[in-house]
């Protein structure tokens, strides 16, 4: 038996939960099938039939028990039975759950996080690589090191200083030679002479090896002097 209530179709089970929607004949038939005695004055009034149906014939969760000793006893049994069903349902859900349920009560807000240190883990990767062959690091570490190690560190830096001084001397000599070959001052060009006259004597520049030897012997003032060309 299916009905239409408020433009919505209702199944038989839904109609059994709402006895006010059932007809008076259906209520009487249901009470007779349940072997519930119905008096003559109750048969006439539909409200009395619905109350009797709610007390005895409606499905158990929605049934209103009478307020007597039997009704109180049945209510206690119902509550005990519902509590058992809840515990069984909760244990089944916990068994299906992979992880336990975490409940935050708000009492502890600051928690300390512990990180397990590994022997050869991420800590070694975070360390900077050791720098080798740098004189600055060796000089920086020398005050903290012992007195025996300090002279060795200073001696190791001496060859580098000697090389730097030698390179500076070479560049200075090359600079002086270029200044000698191309003097910065203006040089007077000789007038053109006719063919057949006496040859002009020019002072030729010394070779490179002789120039280096003379540069070592001469004082620095002689290097900077401009050589003038002499004419006969």
From Swiss-Prot:
Cysteines engaged in disulfide bonds, as pairs: none
Compositionally biased region (Polar residues): 131-148
Basic and acidic residues: compositionally biased ranges: 74-97, 116-127, 163-179, 206-224
Domain of life: Eukaryota
Alphabetized Pfam families for the sequence: Ashwin
Coiled-coil regions listed: none
Phosphothreonine modification, residue list: 197-198
Compartment(s) where it occurs, according to its Swiss-Prot or TrEMBL record: Nucleus
UniProt KW Iron-sulfur keyword: no
Modified residues (Phosphoserine): 112, 182, 184, 189, 193
One BP annotation, GO: embryonic morphogenesis
Region annotated Disordered, chain positions: 74-99, 113-232
Keywords: Nucleus, Phosphoprotein
Any one cellular-component term (Gene Ontology): nucleoplasm
PANTHER family, A to Z: ASHWIN (PTHR28359:SF1)
The family this protein is said to belong to: Belongs to the ashwin family.
Protein name, as recorded: Ashwin
Annotated organism of origin: Rattus norvegicus (Rat)
């Amino acid at each position: 038996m299916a009905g239409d209530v408020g433009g919505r179709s209702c199944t038989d089970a839904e109609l059994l939960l709402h006895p006010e929607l059932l007809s008076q004949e259906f209520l009487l038939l249901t009470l007779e099938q349940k072997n519930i005695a119905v008096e003559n004055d109750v048969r006439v009034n539909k409200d009395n039939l619905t109350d009797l149906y709610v007390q005895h014939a409606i499905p158990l969760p929605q049934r209103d028990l009478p307020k007597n000793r039997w009704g109180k006893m049945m209510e206690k049994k119902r509550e005990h039975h519902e509590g058992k069903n809840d515990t069984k349902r909760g244990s089944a859900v916990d068994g299906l759950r992979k992880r336990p349920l975490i409940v935050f009560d708000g009492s502890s807000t600051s928690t300390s996080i512990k990180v397990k240190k590994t022997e050869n883990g991420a800590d070694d990767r975070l360390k900077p690589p050791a720098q080798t062959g740098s004189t600055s690091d060796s000089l920086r570490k020398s005050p903290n090191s012992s007195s025996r190690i300090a002279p060795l560190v200073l001696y190791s830096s001496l060859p580098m200083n000697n090389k730097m001084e030698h390179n500076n001397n070479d560049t200075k000599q090359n600079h002086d030679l270029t200044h000698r070959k191309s003097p910065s001052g203006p040089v007077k060009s000789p007038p053109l002479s006719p063919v057949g006259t006496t040859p002009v004597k020019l002072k030729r520049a010394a070779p490179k090896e002789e120039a280096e030897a003379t540069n070592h012997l001469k004082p620095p003032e002689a290097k900077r002097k401009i050589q003038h060309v002499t004419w006969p």
